[in-house]
């Protein structure tokens, strides 16, 4: 038993130091290559697979699929102002740009080379990408700003749509509350938020994540690595929305729960700003 515990701790330490090496040492070097050469520019509007830290699979197809899903529930036109929270390396931004479906886009992320790549790939003046030097245990371990203290660099009521894909599925309660409050501050009255999450009550036998451990309102997959997968109850989201003059307008259940035949992997919550 003790041997197993020791091995687990060793594995966790090894994993931690590998992440530190990748994102504290290698990541800045990648940023320099992206900024000053064309070696990592990618092809056909997509980054090289080695740079795509957001998700595995077909970058173009995934972006188009997400934007199509958003468009089924949220009106998009040449006047729509979009905030992309955790924009990554531009999976959604490049899809919006290809389809020319919106009027203004702002995205931010904690991985600098992702922001640098986006700035090179999308030159449209309606699009802007901001580096957020937020501390993140996985992607930005030496970040200068704590997530709970971060203020989105945008004016009040300056967006019609806020998007967060696979962001709240990795945030503890304190950070979730801060990001949600900031998103609602930035949304105009009547604006909508398209957020993905794991709704804890949706779990069934065979669910991808058990989310068996509680940390405050959050339910996590692993106590030793809590940001691996984080879920919340629908009641939590409803209370949070009410605190910020918003309501849940639409819910789409995801297949992570163990249910078959669903369109999305993560659950989708669409909020409407009422005040």
Where are these regions (language model features)?
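Class I (Rossmann-like) S-adenosyl-L-methionine-dependent methyltransferase catalytic domain
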Residues: 2-73, 89-96, 101-151, 177-178, ...
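Conserved class I S-adenosyl-L-methionine
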Residues: 79-88, 106
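Short glycine-centered segments of the SAM/dcSAM-binding site in methyltransferase folds
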Residues: 81, 190-192
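Structural signature of beta-strand start/N-cap positions in the alpha/beta core
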Residues: 81, 104, 158-160
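A conserved beta-strand element that flanks and buttresses the S-adenosyl-L-methionine
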Residues: 163
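Short catalytic micro-motifs in class I SAM-dependent methyltransferases
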Residues: 166-167
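Helix-capping/helix-break motifs at membrane-protein junctions
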Residues: 172-173
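A short glycine-rich, Lys/Arg-flanked "PGG" loop and its adjoining helix->strand segment in the class I
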Residues: 177-189
């Amino acid at each position: 038993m003790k041997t197993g515990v020791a091995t687990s701790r060793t594995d966790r330490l090894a994993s931690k130091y590998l992440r530190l090496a990748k994102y504290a040492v290698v990541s800045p070097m990648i940023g320099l290559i992206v900024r000053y050469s064309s070696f990592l520019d990618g092809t056909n509007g997509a980054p090289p697979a080695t740079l795509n830290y957001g998700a595995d699979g077909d970058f173009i197809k995934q972006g188009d699929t997400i934007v199509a899903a958003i468009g089924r529930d949220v009106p998009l036109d040449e006047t729509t102002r979009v905030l992309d929270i955790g924009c990554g390396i531009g999976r959604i931004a490049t899809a919006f740009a290809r389809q020319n479906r919106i009027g203004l886009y702002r995205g931010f992320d904690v991985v600098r080379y992702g922001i640098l790549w986006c700035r090179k790939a999308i030159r449209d003046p309606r699009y802007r990408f901001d580096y957020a030097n937020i501390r993140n245990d996985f992607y930005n371990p030496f970040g200068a700003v704590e997530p709970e203290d971060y203020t989105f660099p945008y004016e009040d009521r300056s967006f019609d749509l806020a998007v967060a894909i696979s962001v709240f599925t990795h945030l503890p309660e304190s950070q979730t509350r801060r990001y949600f409050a900031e998103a609602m501050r930035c949304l105009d009255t009547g604006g909508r938020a398209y957020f993905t999450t794991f709704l804890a009550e949706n779990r069934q036998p065979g669910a991808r994540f058990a989310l068996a451990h509680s940390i405050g309102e959050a339910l996590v997959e692993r106590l030793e690595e809590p940001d691996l997968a984080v879920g919340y109850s629908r009641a939590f989201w409803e209370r949070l929305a009410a605190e910020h003059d918003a309501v849940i307008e639409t819910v789409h259940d995801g297949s992570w729960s163990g249910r078959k035949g669903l369109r999305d992997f993560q659950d989708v919550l669409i909020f409407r700003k009422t005040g």
